A protein has these predicted regions:
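Conserved catalytic cysteine-centered active-site region
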Residues: 32-36, 40-50, 80-132, 249-281
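A conserved active-site cap/scaffold subdomain adjacent to cofactor or substrate pockets
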Residues: 199-220, 225-248, 270-275
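Condensing-enzyme catalytic core mediating Claisen C-C bond formation in acyl metabolism
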Residues: 1-48, 147-203, 207, 316-390
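Acidic, glycine-rich active-site loops and adjacent beta-strand->loop/helix elements
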Residues: 9-12, 77-82, 109-114, 137-142, ...
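Flexible, glycine-rich active-site loops centered on histidine and acidic residues
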Residues: 126-159
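Catalytic phosphate/nucleotide-handling subdomain of diverse soluble enzymes
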Residues: 287-336
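Short, well-ordered amphipathic alpha-helical segments that serve as non-catalytic structural scaffolds
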Residues: 29, 51-66, 88, 204-220, ...
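Conserved beta-ketoacyl condensing-enzyme motif
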Residues: 5, 51-112, 221-247
Length: 390
């Protein structure tokens, strides 16, 4: 029995901030963002768009009504939780109308969470082969106005349906994970934005890659020639590019180096227009590679490097199956270009707006007409979501 990703899709917010505009407003050389980070645009989520609505939109974009009745597990991987007790997956389960006899829960370990969710989903299908699991990597990266992390914000969700005999890719049994108890990036419960030791986090990302990859090579007796492409966690694409260069073997043929670079460039296309989506960033890169490459084929092995601050990293691989391209979307870039561009002033107002609750802990929200799903009100401190009628 093979297990893997049967369907994969993506959703993001309706608003976009051009980093050229942000750079000019902040008095920054635009090339520090376009070349120094390899970023162009950021998706900006309003108050009515959160990880629940993004996850519902992404999930709905790939699921049929029949599949909603077959799913028996919903996992939301996130570090942008909306409630300290109730899992975002429970909200999403209800919004999508998934059959009631299902497990729904949330997984957290910074940007690594979705990788953990995939492995849990795989184990579930191994034990229950008829099962289907919906994994939703949903996050909003919000650092604050005029902070060092401001150009690496973003919002979005990658949805993946896990099943036996998948139509996109199979998981190979070759993963190596590593844990380090460090403080490179963290967000205490009392803070709405994270604390970041940027230089240290970069060092840890790269060193975790090096050591995890070296252990992977030892365990599975392989090298980069065994892979058609490598996808990386993408807090910003330039860091992943440094990672690629760090593990490129000098003895690797130039033709192979060029191929890995070509596929890397294809893997960052969506992230360059969306920004950082934490748990979803690695898998947005994978989706970008699949939908923008003209040379991938069935049987190709793709390596993936997952990193979550704190820190947990993992190196593993997948293999494309025959007909995988039939499950993909060919107009995603056009859809991203349809987002509404914001001025920097509007971005500051929209992205950092907070609900104005009355004495009972209630607020009625508006302005969500362009969304598929929305947070429409808060009643007695309870978040109320709805599908938006068009």
């Amino acid at each position: 029995m093979t297990i893997g990703i049967d369907k994969i899709g993506f959703a993001t917010s309706q608003y976009v901030l051009k980093l050229q505009d942000l750079a000019e407003t902040r008095g920054i050389d635009p090339e520090k963002l376009s070349k120094g980070l390899l970023l162009k645009e950021l998706s900006i989520a309003p108050l009515t768009e959160d990880i629940v609505t993004l996850a519902a939109s992404a999930g709905n974009s790939i699921l049929t009504e029949e599949e909603k009745q077959e799913i028996d597990m919903v996992i939301v991987a996130t570090e942008s939780g909306v409630d300290q007790s109730k899992a975002a997956a429970v909200f999403v389960h209800g919004l999508l109308g998934i059959q009631p006899f299902a497990r729904s829960f949330e997984i957290k370990e910074a940007c690594y969470g979705a990788t953990a969710a995939l492995h849990y989903a795989k184990l579930h299908v191994e034990n229950s082969p008829k099962s289907k699991v919906l994994v939703l990597a949903s996050d909003i990266a919000r650092y604050g106005v005029e902070t060092s992390g401001e150009p690496t914000q973003g919002a979005g969700c990658v949805a993946m349906l896990i099943s036996q005999n998948p139509r996109v890719m199979v998981f190979n049994n070759d993963n190596v994970a590593q844990t380090r108890d460090i403080m490179d990036f963290w967000r205490p419960n009392y803070s709405t934005t994270p604390f970041v030791n940027g230089v240290y986090s970069t060092q840890q990302y790269l060193d975790s890659l090096k050591t995890t990859w070296e252990e992977y090579q030892k365990r599975y007796d392989c090298d980069l020639n065994d892979f058609e492409a490598i996808c990386f966690h993408l807090p910003y694409p330039k860091l992943a590019l440094k990672g690629l260069k760090k593990i490129l073997d000098k003895s690797l043929p130039q033709e192979k180096k060029d191929l890995l670079q070509k596929h890397f460039d294809e893997s960052i296309i969506y992230s360059q227009k969306v920004g950082n989506i934490y748990t979803g960033s690695l898998f947005l890169g994978l989706l970008s590679l699949l939908e923008n490459s003209d040379s991938l084929k069935a049987g190709d092995k793709i390596a993936l490097y997952s990193y979550g601050s704190g820190a947990v990293s993992e190196f593993f691989s997948v293999e494309l199956v025959e007909g995988y391209e039939k499950q993909l979307q060919n107009n995603r870039l056009d859809l991203l270009d349809q987002r509404q561009a914001l001025s920097v002033a509007d971005y500051e107002r929209i992205f950092f707006e907070e609900a104005n609750l009355d004495e009972s802990g209630s607020a009625t929200l508006s302005g969500y007409e362009g969304q598929d799903y929305a947070l429409v009100e808060i009643v007695d401190h309870q978040r109320r979501y709805s599908k938006v009628e068009k």
